[in-house]
Design a protein with these regions (language model features):
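Extended, charged catalytic domains and RNA/DNA-binding interfaces, predominantly
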Residues: 1-171
Length: 171
């Protein structure tokens, strides 16, 4: 957070770790850190994660909560030893939308192009998924915006660093 605010001079930041690597203890820590660093009107922090389903089940999505305290809905527990809450996993993008709608969480989702590009043709929830990411450290992906417009979707456009180096805003 220090780099984001004091070096990259960002106004807004959200950590986006791969869900299948986020332990429950780290999720709690991340929520605590975002609450500690949030300064309304100066520096806004959001808790979030990257739902990291393979492209065939929906592909990467950035999940961003408006505030702390919401549950993480992973695509899997692939790299986690503790699987005690594996029954809460959302294995497909449709299951993620359903779980977030049913929970009433104050959340937005962005289709993300990274290691597992988001397949926006599979499913879409216009109330939850309000934007697509067209640029990150991984490149520029204008095609995802064009595909969204061809599908008749009204979307926002975002760009993120996603450099996995702990330096948000430095891409």
């Amino acid at each position: 957070m220090n780099f984001a605010r004091n070096k990259a001079f960002l106004d807004v930041v959200c950590h986006q770790g791969n869900d299948f690597q986020i332990k429950d203890s780290f999720w709690k820590h991340l929520n605590d850190v975002t609450a500690d660093w949030n300064e309304p009107g100066r520096f806004t922090t959001f808790p979030g994660y990257e739902w990291s389903g393979n492209t065939a089940v929906g592909g990467d999505r950035n999940v961003i909560f408006a505030e702390e305290g919401f549950a993480i809905r992973r695509c899997s527990h692939a790299l986690l030893e503790d699987r005690s809450d594996a029954d809460t996993d959302a294995h497909t993008i449709s299951q993620l939308y359903q779980a977030l709608r049913e929970s009433g969480d104050n959340v937005v989702i962005f289709a993300h192009v990274g290691g597992r590009y988001a397949d926006i043709h599979l499913d879409h929830d216009p109330e939850l998924e309000t934007a697509v990411e067209i640029h990150s450290d991984w490149g520029t992906f204008e095609w995802i915006a064009r595909d969204s417009f061809r599908l008749g979707r009204r979307i926002g456009i975002v760009a993120n660093s996603d450099g996995h180096k702990g330096r948000p805003g430095a891409s």
